[in-house]
Amino acid sequence: MSQEAILEKVRSIVAEQLSVEASEIKPDSNFQNDLGADSLDTVELVMALEEAFDIEIPDEAAEGITTVGDAVKYIEDKQS
């Protein structure tokens, strides 16, 4: 899956999970500061990404995923 395809899928999941417009979601958007996620939203978002991409994101890794771009890079690395 290309980086662009991953970004689009992540953007769609984030939009649905956080009830924000997909057009507002940029690679450098911070889940909490820019998109209004709280800690529970972040946990649910990680779970949704794990399910959508059929990967496991350990807690230590999840703590380092704070932006849309971080999520895309992590998923891209897991799939290669």
From Swiss-Prot:
Record's comment on post-translational modification: 4'-phosphopantetheine is transferred from CoA to a specific serine of apo-ACP by AcpS. This modification is essential for activity because fatty acids are bound in thioester linkage to the sulfhydryl of the prosthetic group.
Highest taxon above the source species: Bacteria
Any GO BP: lipid A biosynthetic process
Record-level GO cellular component terms: cytosol; membrane
Residue span, Carrier domain: 4-79
Keywords: Cytoplasm, Fatty acid biosynthesis, Fatty acid metabolism, Lipid biosynthesis, Lipid metabolism, Phosphopantetheine, Phosphoprotein
Pathway: Lipid metabolism; fatty acid biosynthesis
SMART domains for this protein: PKS_PP
Pfam families membership: PP-binding
Keyword Phosphoprotein: yes
Record bears the keyword Methyltransferase: no
Location of the protein in the cell: Cytoplasm
Modified residues (O-(pantetheine 4'-phosphoryl)serine): S39
Alphabetized GO MF terms: acyl binding; acyl carrier activity; phosphopantetheine binding
Role summary: Carrier of the growing fatty acid chain in fatty acid biosynthesis.
UniProt family annotation: Belongs to the acyl carrier protein (ACP) family.
NCBIfam families according to UniProt: acyl_carrier (TIGR00517), PRK00982.1-2 (NF002148), PRK00982.1-3 (NF002149), PRK00982.1-4 (NF002150), PRK00982.1-5 (NF002151), PRK12449.1 (NF009104)
Alphabetized PANTHER family for the sequence: ACYL CARRIER PROTEIN, CARRIER DOMAIN-CONTAINING PROTEIN
Annotated protein name in UniProt: Acyl carrier protein
Gene name of the record: acpP
